[in-house]
């Protein structure tokens, strides 16, 4: 086996272990933020939405800067520093009793993510061959789902005792992850050339095809981020107990572990990437619309199942498209900018979703935020369809990934 092949094989295992630690650390804390501050402390949902939206916007919106710096200096220092900042953010969150302190903790957490997320994504593109990426992204999503359930179960159990224990556990996991990267991650370059920070950013901004694709996905992310805000609140309201939230993540894990990889393998042989992305988005949008009208937990979990199935179809295709469009000369910059849609959509989804949720509750129209999200998803579906229908874009970008 050549040294390059050996590095790729070892790199796959490293990426999987690293991803599991990151997912566990994240999901121990973040799914419970809305329960802690809205349900237990009585804050308005929009206050928590601002905190979550701030973290999302900082982490993803500044991702191009983190990616460009990683292109220049390498992945390792950025990843280790970012994970330690995330740990500091979680530690601060544990003592948050005022909105400004929660916002500050989410700011720290987001800045940490800005540093470690783009180089981690670029490492996947660097180490995984193009024809294997869709399947590897599917494996990562399966791992994400399993880690989300384990993390949410652990966090829910710890929340019975003290929210500070929840945050401390998340912080410790990110410190361990930082140590793991500091010890084992080689000093790999992310790009084929050592691209100056400004040049990498300029290269991305001039790529209008990539910029259009990324910005269009903002609507997709407005729906996707509700698994952290409105869906847990809705499950808690219908069930009458925060412990039911863990079953929402258990559903995601069961569906992902049983369906994600088979669907990815089958669909890559029969459908283009853009068709899979659009089909998943349409299912997500339609499943959102009736959520505010259900009164039973069984009905709610059925709609959540449909939402997750849509995500299972769409997410590997979205990740693979982003990697396919990235210029090898500035991988970090491209993967950083690819998060801008998540930054915009996530911030609007969290803040706007929290505001609409409060508005719908006060106006006795609980279906309002869910119908609006469904409409946004359908408009995004139409926008993607228009974008991918352009002959030039289709010919240049969207080959089958099999």
UniProtKB/Swiss-Prot annotation:
Main location: membrane
Ranges of the Cytoplasmic topological domain: 1-12, 117-138, 186-213, 265-276, 321-339, 389-402
Topology relative to the membrane: Multi-pass membrane protein
Protein keywords: Cell inner membrane, Cell membrane, Membrane, Transmembrane, Transmembrane helix, Transport
InterPro entries (alphabetical): MFS, MFS_dom, MFS_trans_sf, MFS_Transporters, Multidrug-R_MdtH
Domain of life of the native organism: Bacteria
Transmembrane segments: 13-33, 99-116, 139-159, 165-185, 214-234, 244-264, 277-297, 300-320, 340-360, 368-388
Stretches in topological domain Periplasmic: 34-98, 160-164, 235-243, 298-299, 361-367
Subcellular localization: Cell inner membrane
A GO MF label: transmembrane transporter activity
GO cellular component: plasma membrane
PANTHER family from the UniProt entry: MULTIDRUG RESISTANCE PROTEIN MDTH, RESISTANCE PROTEIN MDTM, PUTATIVE-RELATED-RELATED
Family to which the UniProt record says this protein belongs: Belongs to the major facilitator superfamily. DHA1 family. MdtH (TC 2.A.1.2.21) subfamily.
Cross-referenced HAMAP family: MFS_MdtH
Name of this protein: Multidrug resistance protein MdtH
Originating organism: Shigella sonnei (strain Ss046)
Source organism phylogeny: Bacteria, Pseudomonadati, Pseudomonadota, Gammaproteobacteria, Enterobacterales
Recorded name of the encoding gene: mdtH
């Amino acid at each position: 086996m050549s040294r390059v092949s050996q590095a790729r094989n070892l790199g796959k295992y490293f990426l999987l272990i690293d991803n599991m630690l990151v997912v566990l650390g994240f999901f121990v804390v973040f799914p419970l933020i809305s329960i802690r501050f809205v349900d237990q402390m009585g804050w308005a949902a929009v206050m928590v939405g601002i905190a979550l939206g701030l973290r999302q916007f900082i982490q993803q919106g500044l991702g191009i800067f983190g990616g460009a710096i990683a292109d220049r200096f390498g992945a390792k220092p950025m990843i280790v520093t970012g994970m330690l900042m995330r740990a500091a953010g979680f530690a601060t969150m544990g003592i948050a009793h005022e909105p400004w302190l929660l916002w500050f903790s989410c700011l720290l957490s987001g800045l940490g993510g800005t540093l470690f997320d783009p180089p981690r994504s670029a490492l996947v593109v660097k180490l995984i061959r193009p024809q294997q990426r869709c399947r590897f992204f599917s494996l990562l999503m399966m791992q994400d789902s399993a880690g989300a359930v384990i993390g949410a179960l652990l966090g829910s159990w710890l929340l019975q005792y003290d929210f500070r224990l929840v945050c401390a556990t998340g912080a410790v996991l990110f410190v361990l992850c930082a140590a793991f990267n500091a010890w084992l991650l080689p000093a790999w370059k992310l790009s084929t050339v050592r691209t100056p920070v400004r040049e990498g950013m300029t290269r991305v901004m001039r790529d209008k095809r990539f910029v259009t694709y990324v910005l269009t996905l903002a609507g997709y992310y407005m729906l996707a981020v509700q698994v952290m805000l409105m869906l847990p609140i809705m499950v808690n309201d219908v069930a009458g107990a925060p412990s039911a939230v863990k079953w929402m993540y258990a559903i995601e894990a069961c569906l992902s572990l049983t369906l994600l990889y088979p669907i990815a393998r089958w669909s890559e042989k029969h459908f283009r990437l853009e068709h899979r992305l659009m089909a998943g988005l349409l299912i997500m949008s339609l499943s959102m619309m009736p959520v505010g009208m259900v009164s039973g937990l069984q009905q709610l979990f059925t709609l959540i199942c449909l939402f997750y199935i849509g995500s299972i179809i769409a997410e590997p295709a979205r990740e693979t498209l982003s990697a396919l469009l990235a210029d090898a000369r500035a991988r970090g910059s491209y993967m950083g900018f690819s998060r801008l849609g998540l930054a915009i959509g996530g911030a609007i989804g969290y803040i706007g979703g929290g505001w609409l949720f409060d508005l719908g509750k006060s106006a006795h129209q609980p279906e309002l935020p869910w119908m609006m999200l469904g409409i946004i998803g359908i408009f995004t579906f139409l926008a993607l369809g228009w974008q991918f229908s352009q002959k030039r874009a289709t010919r240049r970008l969207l080959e089958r990934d099999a």
